[in-house]
Structure formats: C-alpha cells, structure tokens
C-alpha cells in the first residue's frame, strides 16, 4: 500500500528570521500538497490562519519554543493566545532542566497547565529526546499519557539532534497504539520519513515536506 506522506506532514517554518512572505509561501505549499498542518511560531499564527482559511490544512503553533524554560504561566498564556488567534494544534516544549533536576512534579504541572488552557485543542509535548536518557523519555511519555495529551514529539530541531528511529520506537512502545507520536528534526527525505512512520510516528514535523512528497532529496539544512 502506498503511503500518503502528505497526511503525515506538519509543514514547518520556525526560524527566528522567517519573514511573513516565507510564511505565506509555506501556507501555499501546504494547500497545494494537502499537508496535514503548518507549524509556525505563535506570532505568525494570525497570518497562517488567514492564509489557510477555508482549506483543510490546520494551523499548529509552538509554545515556549525552543528552550521550554520559561514560566509555566507564560506558556499557558501563550497557548491560549495562540488558540484565540487561530491555532488548531499546540506543540509545547517541556522544561528539560527541571526534568534533569528531578523536579518531576513541576514538569507535570507545566504540561498540565498548558493542556488545561488548550481545552479541546490537540496538544503535542516536545521532549527534546537528544538531551534525555531512555529512562527520562519513558518517564515523560508516561506522564503525557496520564495527562491525556494528544501527542508526544521528539524534538525542537534547535538542539543537538533530531528524531531518531530508536527514540520513536521507544515512545510508541511507552504510550501504546492510540496516542500520537510526532517525529521532528532532521526528517528531510522520503526514506527517513518512512523509517519514522514504520517506527510508530503518526505525524512528521519537517521543513522538507515538498521534497518528501515528491521523492526528492532536500537540503542538508533545515528543520
């Protein structure tokens, strides 16, 4: 059976120097190729929502991005503001420093605060797996399952590494068959996308969506 790669793709542009014209182009590409969503910084949600109005492509906003180290109240507020501006999905970054400090209750409360402000809007929780041990990945995945979030997500694409097959497999094994798993960071071609899907990913975050659906090799840089 042929994989419908477009349905997996969150077409992504999160660079700090991304221009409005580039966001508009991102949205046009997403409509043309029928991607699942575009993923942008919260400040560009109104532009993306306007460009995608009337289409099937959803608007996803990152929150607390890329460090995840801000105040919990700020993350919760940003999530609600992004939803009010037109975001239909939210991707938040956990506080990795708190996790590594053993502040597990604070990490869970941080996720819960954003989840509570998302209401019915799907929440994806970014683990930044390149910075975590397998035990920590399992710990956060179990936490997210308990909090009934929609997805766990591998990476911001702004740290020391992106999605790895073994991490996606571990995340899938931990959360079970129903919860979403998003592989993001360094997924730049169809072969890598297929590897992630076979490992258990149900969404792919990438700036190389056009290359993936066309079967081409994308640039070595990019999300």
Curated annotation (Swiss-Prot):
Catalytic activity: 2-deoxy-D-ribose 5-phosphate = D-glyceraldehyde 3-phosphate + acetaldehyde
Known EC number: 4.1.2.4
Subcellular location: Cytoplasm
This protein's pathway: Carbohydrate degradation; 2-deoxy-D-ribose 1-phosphate degradation; D-glyceraldehyde 3-phosphate and acetaldehyde from 2-deoxy-alpha-D-ribose 1-phosphate: step 2/2
Residues annotated as catalytic: 91 (proton donor/acceptor), 153 (schiff-base intermediate with acetaldehyde), 182 (proton donor/acceptor)
Pfam families: DeoC
Enzyme class: lyase
GO cellular component terms listed in the entry, alphabetical order: cytoplasm
CDD domains: DeoC
Listed GO biological process terms: 2-deoxyribose 1-phosphate catabolic process; carbohydrate catabolic process; deoxyribonucleotide catabolic process
Keyword Ion transport: no
Function: Catalyzes a reversible aldol reaction between acetaldehyde and D-glyceraldehyde 3-phosphate to generate 2-deoxy-D-ribose 5-phosphate.
Family per similarity comment: Belongs to the DeoC/FbaB aldolase family. DeoC type 1 subfamily.
Protein name, per record: Deoxyribose-phosphate aldolase
Organism of derivation: Yersinia pseudotuberculosis serotype O:1b (strain IP 31758)
């Amino acid at each position: 059976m042929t994989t419908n790669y477009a349905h997996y793709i969150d077409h992504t542009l999160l660079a700090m120097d991304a221009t409005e014209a580039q966001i508009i182009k991102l949205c046009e590409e997403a409509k043309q190729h029928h991607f699942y969503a575009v993923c942008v910084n919260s400040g560009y949600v109104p532009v993306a929502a306007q460009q995608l109005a009337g289409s099937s492509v959803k608007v996803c906003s990152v929150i607390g991005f890329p460090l995840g180290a801000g105040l919990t109240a700020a993350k919760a507020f940003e999530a609600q503001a992004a939803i009010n501006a037109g975001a239909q999905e939210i991707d938040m970054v956990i506080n990795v420093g708190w996790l590594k400090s053993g502040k597990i209750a604070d990490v869970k409360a941080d996720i819960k605060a954003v989840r509570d402000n998302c209401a019915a809007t799907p929440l994806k929780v970014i683990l930044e797996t390149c910075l975590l041990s397998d035990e920590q990945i399992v710990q956060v995945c179990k936490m997210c399952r308990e909090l009934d979030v929609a997805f766990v997500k591998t990476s911001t694409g702004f740290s020391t590494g992106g999605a790895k097959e073994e991490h996606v497999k571990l995340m899938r094994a931990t959360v079970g068959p129903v919860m979403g798993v998003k592989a993001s960071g360094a997924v730049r071609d169809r072969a890598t996308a297929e590897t992630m899907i076979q490992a258990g990913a149900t969404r792919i975050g990438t700036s190389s969506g056009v290359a993936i659906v066309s079967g081409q090799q994308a640039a070595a840089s990019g999300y």
